[in-house]
Amino acid sequence: MTTEKINLLDFDRKGLRTFFAEELGEKAFRAEQVMKWIYHFGCDDFDQMNNINKQLREKLKAKCEIRAPYVSEAQHSADGTIKWAMRVGDQDVETVYIPEDDRATLCVSSQVGCALECKFCSTAQQGFNRNLRVSEIIGQVWRAAREIGLEKETGRRPITNVVMMGMGEPLLNMKNLIPALEIMLDDLGFGLSKRRVTVSTSGVVSGLEQMIGQIDVALAISLHAPNDKLRSEIMPINDRWNIEAFLEVVRRYIASSNANRGKVTVEYVLLDHVNDGTEHAHELAELLKGTPCKINLIPFNPYPGSPYKKPSNSRIDRFQKTLMQYEHTVTIRKTRGDDIDAACGQLVGDVIDRTKRTKAKQFDGQAIPVKTL
């Protein structure tokens, strides 16, 4: 019988130190040496770790592995965006690299599929299968960094920012999300600034409550409607946690956070003649008066079978100008990678849907009926 090896990508620094001490009988600094090899040098071969003694290397080879998701398919957009299908077990999630003049952002998935059933999102139409492990979340960053490193001659910019805006709802996977974020921020990990790591949530109030005082990163909230009636129609999660409850915990999080500089990013997808009217803009502006924020408008990115359309440029422009009358900071997200279905709301992966085979899903020990999400 073969014993499954321990994947070291599943540990943040604290967990790795504990594992080395309790399971390997090694001093903590050895764990930190190995962690530096993994993340600073992209190393997954213990034999290449030349400042680690041979006895420990042999012990690591016998008991451990460094295994990130692998790229099963890569698609390149005309604008430089790359979408990778990352293989996790017997399924794929999608990870997107978005280069810009002054940064390169990696959009990372947190779940295989999504259970939230937002009506305008392609991922939601795939159903939900499972949460990703720490190694499968941070492994997307590790693999992407290696892929970009292999293309140095192309002049591709190294990853400077990570956004948890891929497939899934990050705050329904807190057990694995928090250690992955810790590795992104850790100097022995990817060493990213907390202002360059963003978690986006559709309104999981219980998860955001847990984040207060536990992890400090930039926050983006998927609001997408100015009132509960409309939001519940397009985002069923609103029936569980309404806008008032959502914004209340958002205000508390940003008050406790240095990463957000006192403001949260409010994401608002514009759906033609659904939530993009002038009356919606006025209502949204009034709603957000008590919440320090910047508003990011996202023109809808179509996908096959969707009942929604992207608004005309004139409607988008009018919506933005109406919000700006209230002295809100308002930007319009530039669509990137839509020619390879890598834009916001278009990620689908390869998901074996399990939501239709069970009445409830278990998220971090809490049973949440799918129909009430």
From Swiss-Prot:
**Keyword DNA-binding attributed:** no
Q: Which InterPro entries match?
A: Aldolase_TIM, Methyltransferase_A, RlmN_N, RNA_MTrfase_RlmN, rRNA_lsu_MTrfase_RlmN/Cfr, rSAM
> What's its top-level EC category?
transferase
Residues given in the record as S-adenosyl-L-methionine binding sites:
G168, E169, S200, S222, L223, H224, N301
Tell me where in this chain the Radical SAM core domain is found: 100-339
Please list the GO terms describing molecular function.
4 iron, 4 sulfur cluster binding; metal ion binding; rRNA (adenine(2503)-C2-)-methyltransferase activity; rRNA binding; tRNA (adenine(37)-C2)-methyltransferase activity; tRNA binding
Disulfide bridge map: C107-C344
Q: Which UniProt keywords apply?
A: 4Fe-4S, Cytoplasm, Disulfide bond, Iron, Iron-sulfur, Metal-binding, Methyltransferase, rRNA processing, S-adenosyl-L-methionine, Transferase, tRNA processing
Can you state which reaction this protein catalyses? adenosine(2503) in 23S rRNA + 2 reduced [2Fe-2S]-[ferredoxin] + 2 S-adenosyl-L-methionine = 2-methyladenosine(2503) in 23S rRNA + 5'-deoxyadenosine + L-methionine + 2 oxidized [2Fe-2S]-[ferredoxin] + S-adenosyl-L-homocysteine; adenosine(37) in tRNA + 2 reduced [2Fe-2S]-[ferredoxin] + 2 S-adenosyl-L-methionine = 2-methyladenosine(37) in tRNA + 5'-deoxyadenosine + L-methionine + 2 oxidized [2Fe-2S]-[ferredoxin] + S-adenosyl-L-homocysteine
Query: Any note on cofactor binding?
Result: Binds 1 [4Fe-4S] cluster. The cluster is coordinated with 3 cysteines and an exchangeable S-adenosyl-L-methionine.
EC assignment: 2.1.1.192
Could you say which residues bind [4Fe-4S] cluster here? C114, C118, C121
**Which coarse location class describes where this protein primarily resides?**
cytoplasm
Q: Where in the cell is it found?
A: Cytoplasm
Look up the record and give one Gene Ontology term from the biological process aspect. rRNA base methylation
Another remark in the UniProt entry says: Reaction proceeds by a ping-pong mechanism involving intermediate methylation of a conserved cysteine residue.
Q: Which family does it belong to?
A: Belongs to the radical SAM superfamily. RlmN family.
What name does UniProt use for this protein?
Dual-specificity RNA methyltransferase RlmN
Q: Which organism is the protein's source?
A: Vibrio cholerae serotype O1 (strain ATCC 39315 / El Tor Inaba N16961)
Upper taxonomic classification of the species? Bacteria, Pseudomonadati, Pseudomonadota, Gammaproteobacteria, Vibrionales
